[in-house]
Amino acid sequence: MMDAPVSTPPQRVVSLVPSVTESLFELGVGDRVIGITDYCVHPAEQVARLPRIGGTKNPDVEQIIALRPDLVIANQEENREADVVALQAAGLPVWVTFPKTVREAFNLLWNIMYVFDEPSMVERIRSTEWLCDWLERMEQPECKVFVPIWSDPLMTFNADTFAHDVLRVCGGTNVFADRERLYPLAADLGQAEPLSADDPRAVGRDTRYPRVTLAEVEAAQPDVILLPSEPFAFNASHIPVFAALDIPAARNQNIRLVDGSLLTWHGTRLARALNTLPNLLCPSKSEV
């Protein structure tokens, strides 16, 4: 995660990251935001009045340039390198963020405070950090969790992701923490031999989001299954697919729909995640 390429507090900001957009408003500097993506939906009332510059993967670079921002905030995973390069070539400072753990997300929030020179953020950030510290110190029984992020093909995430670390802090053990995505697709589904790590067709590929089978889910024996609303919009109609498996989550009716942003949005939404997810993962513990 690179440092912000500005020497004075920015006054005209374009955010290409939905979670950062929300954080800027909740930390008191939303009045400096002059452009956002189509996926920046929170806080709803405040963002409704702002210019939209396209999607996270297909922003209108010329429109961003025309807005004359003194800082563009992007994310290494959510935005395309080609768009970042184009904005930089036009002379715009671009801050590329990429928190992959909860602690790195807190570091980003502190960096936002320093970059925007807004000390009023301290109490908000520190209170969420204290909650995280408390959760990490708790002795928690193992709670094996499966979280799909796509339906067809069925996909999940491994330990090298922000969502995995959110689960960890909240008391969950990701059942596919050690599973890497294999290439080609047939190999990921156990139907062919995978390419070797040094094969040119596999080098540089993202291995953090493996495709898995229902048989693998059954073998992993999760205690809880969380069906998130994003990136794939799981709903009640998907519950029977997993309820039919011979797993503790099905037997104990612990297959739950969840707001996907609690797992994947870094930033101030962490406060909601840390207050909500532990109760979904270990309800008996939270009631003690």
Task: Go through each PLM region and give its residues.
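N-terminal ligand-binding lobe of clamshell/alpha-beta domains
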Residues: 1-288
